């Protein structure tokens, strides 16, 4: 479809009208360029897909929504906007689209959040009730569900009143009533515990109401995991050919796709025997109490017992073999080099893939039949069996995927990382098996790039080391296929608005020098804190261990620090904002996740402290396998893997400081390798251009601490 004069005029008119809706709106050339590039791509005028890096301040969300909505209407398609986290998803749904509705009055939009973000009305009704009969409803749903106390009951009653009175849409983030994680776990549900159409509350269930709204919406705000799952199952969203797709925070997409290719499951022989026995009893119960119209052949007790016995024998053999490979210690790990399994193990995995898939099919067959049973049955008993069968289906589905992945030599032309772990839980030894595909470009090509005609991949950070090459390798997007890669200029004057401070540290932040380095860092940080020049500060760490050691060094000012994990992130940010706005000092302290999606403008954040260059963990089985594979191809893992990842992380961390034209401040990086190593200048060149200062660090005397024990990845 060509961009007609009428369509261009519509986009221009909406953009002009938008300026009247936003106070102090500043027209920006990068924003106009992005609108034009997005429009040309979605209309099919130029290229297949577009990867466009839009730095903070460009206004990327509105830059893709305006042309996206206009073209979706013209082509009678649905615009799907996908994000990587709930915060941005909710911002688009609750802020950006309502703003656009002021200039596009008939705009229809909805959000497709994950099931776990919505309240389960069945659970809410039971927890809100003071009637024992209502609470008894939950007895068969969750054996571990703890009874609510009076305070929780009152809170749930208020939530139920808001839900029934249409004052609340059922989303956790859309209520002012405080809900801690433990209570929300009981108020929400997951796929295995959902009765779906069999539930008495199905018609008014917030989750299913939202899913039904998708069919009528012009714009659907989703997340990457849901989009990937929807493309795989052809459910939830319209057909790919009827979509316009925008992947915001698109740098996360390869990781989300990799998560779909990451399987871990317990394979302890005794545990597995218990699960198989429970499933056999469940099948027998279903046959006796809710006999299906057509009996699956495998439901025959003798056949099922023989089938399960073969599964168990294979699992027991695999346990014995894996225990020979793992060290003698109770907690141990063994990774298979290049993901290559011994022939004996590979044969077991291939056989288990077939056997567990057959059990998955049997559970699915029973579940489909149970879901069609009429009200003539005991509803509580029926629902109990449905939920138990749902759980069995989920377990065998996960097992089937695990063994299929274990049976693969390669995925997307790269090895599948495979390893086993043995660990102690509640005094008992447990064995787990893990598989992760280290490349996902084939999956993305099949589900997205080949299926959806035109896709926009955007983020404030898509490049590392000033190059799109890492994104291209991980995602499978390529110029040869007609994909375009655009990097927009930042609208900010970083030279005038900030500076980069690299203190003259005596120690590099290596594992051997960690104690001395953190002591130096704490001394400089304390000096900055005592100067009282900055009210809003952020301290970012590459590891939880380093963060905890730092906190020990500054324990006397702990009350000023708002530390990741103390409370939910949104509450920490809210408290930080209140403190600074009331004239107090406040310091947010967190890990890499705090380097993304944190938007604190002006005085709310004027100094960012970065512990060190965040290279990927060297003890990760996935990273090690990828390194082995790269070496086998005569490629240097540090150049292909570690340095681009570190560059990307550093760009995001530094990007927390300048969020608007009014922002002023400095970024402190406690890593002298930026100035002493050959790669340091390359990392600096990929950052915004700041003037650099190198102040002295206070003298610190610290005794070297014993080298910390290496932690296993689980």
From Swiss-Prot:
Motif (DEAH box): 248-251
SUPFAM superfamilies: P-loop containing nucleoside triphosphate hydrolases
Cofactors required: [4Fe-4S] cluster
GO biological process, alphabetically ordered: DNA repair; SOS response
UniProt entry keywords in alphabetical sequence: 4Fe-4S, ATP-binding, DNA-binding, Helicase, Hydrolase, Iron, Iron-sulfur, Isomerase, Metal-binding, Nucleotide-binding
Domain Helicase C-terminal: 517-698
Domain Helicase ATP-binding: 17-294
Domain of life: Bacteria
Entries under Pfam families matching the protein: DEAD, DEAD_2, Helicase_C_2
EC number(s) from the headed UniProt entry: 5.6.2.3
Transit peptide found in the keyword field: no
Cofactor note (record): Binds 1 [4Fe-4S] cluster.
Gene Ontology molecular function: 4 iron, 4 sulfur cluster binding; 5'-3' DNA helicase activity; ATP binding; ATP hydrolysis activity; DNA binding; DNA/RNA helicase activity; metal ion binding
PROSITE patterns: HELICASE_ATP_BIND_2 (PS51193), HELICASE_CTER (PS51194)
Binding, ATP: 54-61
Coiled coil: none
Catalytic activity: Couples ATP hydrolysis with the unwinding of duplex DNA at the replication fork by translocating in the 5'-3' direction. This creates two antiparallel DNA single strands (ssDNA). The leading ssDNA polymer is the template for DNA polymerase III holoenzyme which synthesizes a continuous strand; ATP + H2O = ADP + phosphate + H(+)
Residues where [4Fe-4S] cluster binds: 120, 194, 199, 205
Record family assignment: Belongs to the helicase family. DinG subfamily. Type 1 sub-subfamily.
Function, in words: DNA-dependent ATPase and 5'-3' DNA helicase. Unwinds D-loops, R-loops, forked DNA and G-quadruplex DNA.
Name this protein carries in UniProt: ATP-dependent DNA helicase DinG
Species per Swiss-Prot/TrEMBL record: Salmonella choleraesuis (strain SC-B67)
Gene label: dinG
């Amino acid at each position: 479809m060509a961009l007609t004069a009428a369509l261009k005029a519509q986009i221009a008119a909406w953009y002009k009208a938008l300026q009247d809706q936003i106070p102090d709106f500043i027209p920006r050339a990068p924003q106009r360029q992005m609108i034009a590039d997005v429009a040309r791509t979605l209309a099919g005028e130029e290229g297949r897909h577009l990867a466009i890096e839009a730095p903070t301040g460009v206004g990327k969300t509105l830059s893709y929504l305006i042309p996206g909505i206009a073209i979706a209407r013209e082509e009678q398609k649905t615009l799907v906007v996908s994000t990587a986290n709930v915060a941005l998803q909710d911002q688009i749904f609750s802020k950006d689209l309502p703003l656009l509705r002021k200039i596009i009055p008939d705009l229809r939009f909805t959000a497709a959040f994950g099931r776990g973000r919505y309240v389960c009305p069945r659970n809410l009704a039971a927890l809100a009730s003071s009637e024992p009969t209502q609470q008894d409803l939950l007895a068969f749903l969750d054996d571990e569900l703890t009874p609510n106390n009076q305070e929780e009951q009152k809170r749930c009653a208020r939530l139920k009143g808001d839900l029934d009175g249409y004052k609340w849409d059922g989303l956790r983030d859309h209520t002012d009533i405080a809900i801690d994680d433990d209570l929300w776990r009981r108020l929400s549900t997951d796929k295995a515990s959902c009765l779906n159409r069999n539930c008495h509350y199905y018609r008014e269930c917030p989750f299913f109401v939202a899913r039904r709204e998708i069919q009528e919406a012009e714009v659907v705000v989703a997340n990457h995991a849901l989009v990937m799952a929807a493309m795989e199952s052809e459910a939830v969203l319209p057909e790919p050919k009827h979509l316009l797709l925008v992947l915001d925070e698109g740098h996360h997409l390869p990781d989300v796709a990799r998560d779909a290719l990451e399987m871990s499951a317990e394979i302890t022989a005794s545990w597995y025997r218990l699960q198989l026995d429970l499933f056999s009893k469940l099948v027998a119960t279903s046959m006796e109490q809710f006999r299906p119209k057509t009996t699956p052949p495998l439901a025959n007790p003798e056949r099922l017992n023989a089938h399960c016995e073969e599964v168990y024998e294979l699992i027991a053999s695999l346990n014995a073999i894996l225990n020979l490979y793992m060290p003698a210690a109770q907690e141990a790990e063994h990774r298979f080099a290049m993901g290559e399994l011994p022939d004996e193990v590979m044969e077991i995995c291939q056989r288990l893939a077939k056997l567990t898939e057959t059990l998955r099919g049997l559970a699915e067959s029973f579940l489909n039949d149970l879901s069609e049973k009429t009200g003539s049955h005991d509803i509580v008993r029926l629902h109990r069996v449905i939920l138990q069968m749902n759980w069995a289906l989920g377990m065998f589905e996960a097992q089937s995927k695990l063994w299929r992945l274990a049976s693969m030599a390669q995925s997307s032309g790269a090895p599948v990382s495979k390893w086993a772990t043995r660990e102690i839980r509640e005094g008992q030894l447990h064995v787990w098996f893990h598989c992760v595909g280290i490349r996902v470009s084939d999956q993305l090509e099949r589900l997205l790039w080949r299926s959806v005609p035109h896709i926009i991949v955007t983020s404030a950070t898509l490049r590392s080391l000033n190059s799109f090459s890492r994104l291209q390798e991980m995602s499978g997007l390529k110029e040869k296929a007609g994909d375009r890669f655009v990097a927009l200029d930042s609208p900010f004057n970083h030279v005038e608005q900030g500076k980069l401070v690299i203190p003259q540290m005596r120690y590099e932040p290596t594992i051997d020098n960690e104690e001395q380095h953190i002591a130096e860092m704490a001394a400089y940080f304390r000096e900055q804190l005592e100067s009282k020049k900055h009210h809003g500060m952020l301290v970012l760490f590459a590891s939880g261990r380093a963060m905890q050691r730092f906190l020990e060094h500054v324990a006397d000012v702990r009350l000023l620090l708002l530390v990741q994990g103390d409370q939910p992130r949104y509450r920490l940010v809210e408290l930080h904002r209140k403190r600074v706005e009331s004239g107090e000092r406040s310091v947010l302290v967190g890990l890499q996740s705090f380097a993304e999606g944190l938007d604190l403008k002006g005085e709310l954040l004027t100094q960012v402290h970065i512990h060190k260059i965040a290279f990927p963990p060297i003890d990760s089985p996935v990273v090690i396998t990828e390194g082995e594979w790269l070496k086998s191809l005569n490629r240097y893992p540090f150049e292909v893997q570690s340095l681009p990842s570190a560059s990307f992380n550093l760009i995001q961390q530094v990007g927390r400081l300048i969020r608007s034209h009014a922002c002023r401040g400095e970024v402190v990086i406690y890593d002298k390798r930026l100035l002493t190593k050959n790669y340091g200048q390359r990392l600096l060149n990929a950052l915004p251009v700041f003037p650099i200062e190198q102040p002295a660090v206070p003298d610190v005397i610290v005794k070297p601490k014993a080298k910390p024990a290496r932690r296993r990845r689980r």
